């Protein structure tokens, strides 16, 4: 059953055949998918109501966090994380048939296939999107160019799959946030995960004190990442996800964090991916 029947258009970053489009289709199989060239453009489309929601990658099990999406969640107002989907990533080397000496793909995909490329002496060439790289190879007709993308991209752009499952880790997967317009939900029934970010007070031990807000209440953090705060040397913004087993304890932890940190932004409270 479609969890969001009123959503008819869902955005993603990339071109048709991108992993992000696959994730969007998995979440909203009946909605029209709309690709955007950048994450910023996807957020703009959400704000202007060009799309009802956007499915955007926030972290990969090999490559780590997707910094730009996390930064935009902090910077943009009027949006929230209302769900998530974990999508397996199975990279393929695509080409026209001749030996590949250069592989075009998104930097994250290149990083995830580093061992495969190095073992074969294939040059990694950064491109804005995996599916876009496949399209460029198909249209460019440059000898020796190949792309790292999905099997779906190979089919869409008429390329051959030269090698499958070339990622360094077979458990490679990406977690996508379902972002829509609205106010982030508070902990409550049926909502089992929280995503937020905070800036710690600029004093010794501030991060430890902030994290104590969770540990004292038996809350399990499933993610903790940090990013430098622009124009504030040695200040950091921390990104946190945690599981909700007790909604009251989760609410208390959020209140305690607001007292301890300089700034807190709740991205959303939502059902965790199964």
Describe each PLM feature range.
Residues 1-274:
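Domain-level signature for soluble enzymes in the chorismate/prephenate branch of the shikimate pathway
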């Amino acid at each position: 059953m479609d969890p969001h029947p009123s959503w008819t258009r869902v955005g993603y970053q990339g071109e048709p055949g991108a992993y992000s489009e696959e994730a969007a289709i998995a979440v909203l199989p009946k909605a029209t998918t709309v690709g955007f060239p950048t994450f910023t453009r996807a957020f703009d489309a959400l704000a202007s109501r060009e799309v009802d929601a956007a499915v955007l990658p926030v972290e990969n099990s090999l490559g780590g966090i997707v910094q730009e999406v996390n930064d935009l969640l902090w910077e943009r107002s009027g949006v929230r994380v209302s769900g998530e989907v974990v999508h397996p990533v199975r990279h393929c080397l695509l080409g026209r048939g001749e030996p590949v000496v250069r592989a075009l793909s998104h930097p994250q995909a290149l990083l995830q296939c580093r061992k495969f490329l190095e073992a074969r002496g294939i040059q990694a060439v950064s491109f804005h999107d995996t599916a876009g790289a496949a399209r460029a190879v198909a249209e460019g007709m440059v000898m020796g160019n190949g792309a790292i993308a999905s099997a779906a991209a190979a089919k869409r752009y008429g390329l051959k799959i030269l090698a499958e499952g070339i990622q360094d880790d077979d458990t490679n997967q990406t977690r996508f946030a379902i972002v829509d317009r609205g106010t982030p939900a508070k902990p409550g029934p049926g909502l089992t995960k929280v995503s937020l970010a905070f800036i710690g007070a600029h004093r010794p031990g501030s991060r430890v004190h902030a994290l104590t807000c969770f540990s004292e209440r038996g809350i399990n953090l499933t993610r903790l990442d940090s990013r430098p705060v622009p124009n504030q040397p040695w200040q950091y913004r921390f990104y946190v996800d945690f599981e909700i087993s007790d909604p009251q304890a989760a609410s208390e932890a959020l209140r305690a964090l607001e007292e301890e940190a300089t700034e807190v932004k709740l991205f959303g409270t939502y059902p965790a991916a199964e």
